[in-house]
Amino acid sequence: MRYLPVFALLVFLVACGVNPNPANPDLTPIAKPNTTQTYDMLSWMTMSPTLSSGHHMAGTANPLYTTMTSSRMYWTKTQAGYPWDVQLFDKNFIYLWVTELDWKNPRSFKVFHSPTLGKFNLPLVPRWAKGGYPGSSIKISDSSYEIHSDCNTFVKKNLGHVINEVWGPYKESLGGQLPNNLETLVISYRYTCDPNYSNCFNKEEYHVAKPYGLVKWQHQSLGSDGTYNPPDNVTYFNHVVSGQVSPVTACF
């Protein structure tokens, strides 16, 4: 699966508001819109330890192996141990950090890095997030990142303004070995937004569920009418398969 959790210091937790480009997932809510329930997002985004010790997810594209350290979460995409998506986490947030550049070269990658906030400039979700439609929301004005052709050779880029939201819970039937009406949360990641956090040209959705972690990912682009076009890339992770790998990294 070649999904790009494409790269987003001022970070603001904001109250829910009306956005001219509706970003809600195309799903039916199952809870009251004013729900105040909070969710441990690390446990929703990662396969449970009892499963991940000997299993991984597979589906319509590449496999997905979950590995954890005390401060990093790896989604490894092949049996070779790379490429990967690497998220950082602490008691406050889970942060997008590293994704691949060349699937065949672990010394090439894209990494969020800000002159002011270092590697913590793109919080994806609060560590403990509020549910809702939407629930927790984060606005990011500094989306600085680096494109590395080698460990120490890189160019600097940015994604414009970014807004990340948690939506749900929902009930989804995603096929494969997953149960019907699986309870999910949807992380909406919108980037290349204008300075008002509107007209975000790109939107990605991470659909996560216990005890599996990531069960669906999709990308949409903003249409000329100001609404999001149907997904142009969708991947399902709906099979639990035996086997685990250790991430292979060369530069971090």
Predicted regions, residues:
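C-terminal motif of bacterial Sec signal peptides marking the signal peptidase cleavage site
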Residues: 12-15
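Sec-dependent signal peptide recognition
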Residues: 2-9
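Bacterial signal peptide processing site
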Residues: 17-20
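Conserved functional acidic sites
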Residues: 24-252
